[in-house]
């Protein structure tokens, strides 16, 4: 490690790392948690890289090595395996990105690393940080999802109104038809009443020409036909009450 620290002083890391110092993993850690590490090559030469960790059984790294062409960026996915998180236990896991300028002819990557001289190697270290979302974050995440049904309810509230309007239109149409029917009935009754009145007048004229004793029959006929105007008034009152009652309700 002393030689590695010496090389750090001699050769600064050529790659630009994002993030530069910390790899953050956000829980819960009951499933695989992935974070990305971007490696950018700002130089005009090809750069070989290798990603190492102090806890190889806890992480899966893809790709864990390769070559980056000049001006290009490679994204490395670091996958933390599920584990029982203890907030009192601080993570001691670390990663190291080791790099070397690629030789002109590369036939075997393993041979390149084995034959590399210490002063040719460059490396950067990153520490792992575990973050567990607190209760406030959970509430903030839940509030928008709760707000959606409320807004939807507000939007859905006025929807039944067109339905109620259509019902009133239907009811009005029925009332109009009922009105027409009742008007027809009233016209028939009026016509019958007129005929009965004419018949009454005719009988009255006949009575004058007949004996005085026959007036009782004429008066009897008049008493029979006299309730018809009252009947028309009652029917009209019932019709008006029915019509107004339907509209008020």
Swiss-Prot record:
TM ranges: 228-248
Main location: endoplasmic reticulum
Topology Cytoplasmic: residue spans: 2-227
One GO location term (cellular component): endoplasmic reticulum
Modified residues (Phosphoserine): 166, 214, 216, 219
Modified residues (N6-acetyllysine): 125
Recorded topology in the membrane: Single-pass type IV membrane protein
InterPro entries recorded: Ig-like_fold, MSP_dom, PapD-like_sf, VAP
Coiled-coil blocks: 169-205
Site (Involved in binding the phosphorylated serine of the phospho-FFAT motif): 50
Gene Ontology molecular-function annotations: protein-membrane adaptor activity
Chain spans, region phosphorylated FFAT motif binding: 50-53
Keyword terms of this UniProt record: Acetylation, Cell junction, Cell membrane, Coiled coil, Disulfide bond, Endoplasmic reticulum, Membrane, Phosphoprotein, Tight junction, Transmembrane, Transmembrane helix
A Pfam family hit: Motile_Sperm
UniProt modified residues of type Phosphothreonine: 170
Domain notes: The MSP domain binds the FFAT motif of many proteins.
The protein's role, per its UniProt record: Endoplasmic reticulum (ER)-anchored protein that mediates the formation of contact sites between the ER and endosomes via interaction with FFAT motif-containing proteins such as STARD3 or WDR44. STARD3-VAPA interaction enables cholesterol transfer from the ER to endosomes. Via interaction with WDR44 participates in neosynthesized protein export. In addition, recruited to the plasma membrane through OSBPL3 binding. The OSBPL3-VAPA complex stimulates RRAS signaling which in turn attenuates integrin beta-1 (ITGB1) activation at the cell surface. With OSBPL3, may regulate ER morphology.
Family stated for the protein in its record: Belongs to the VAMP-associated protein (VAP) (TC 9.B.17) family.
This protein's name: Vesicle-associated membrane protein-associated protein A
Classification of source organism: Eukaryota, Metazoa, Chordata, Craniata, Vertebrata
